[in-house]
């Protein structure tokens, strides 16, 4: 019964399950669900990141897209790709960035060899705690160049700085998640798609919250108190979706000077 299933998920949170119209033995189906892979500890970014360096030059091609003002290239950004959405790259080009894309498993020296003005850390799938190679790389880059992270990139920054993440009982999915901007007390409607979050009580003293989810009070954004580093859990580049937070790309450009 669909209603019974919804009630169970609402009370107990997201869980593994099997839907079948072939095998009808309940015991076998339960065992299949139990033996299926879990998201916890899964480094899925390895499966979707590119194998080699590339460049990205395409900005917005639709003249009706006006939420970021076109700007001539003034900054060089290295984007670490853990499964990046292409509209993020378009947004970076739109604000005046020459973009070099590197695989998410590159080293900090690989990044610095490109002599970027700023570093972008992308979204991607899986458990952020499992992407340990990225924790190391990012920790070595903090303070060297301005850094901006989105979604998984936000979570990886947290780990690199000593914080931790946890699996949400109910993942944030959809394009109407309300987020409070703590700097101006304005509410932004955001697009979100994540099952893990950064533990706010695990943030080191060097990091401070900037955005909070109004549905469950979880952390949605943070910044470094003294260094040019910021990140958000949601998707300011959403396509399609709300553009209340597109200013973050311009804030990143301003961080680069």
Segments and roles (model prediction):
Residues 2-115, 128, 239-241, 251-257:
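RNA-binding accessory domains that recognize and position tRNA/RNA substrates
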Residues 113, 118, 122-200, 241-255:
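Cysteine-nucleophile active-site neighborhood
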Residues 185-227:
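Catalytic beta-strand/loop cores that center a nucleophilic Ser/Cys/Thr
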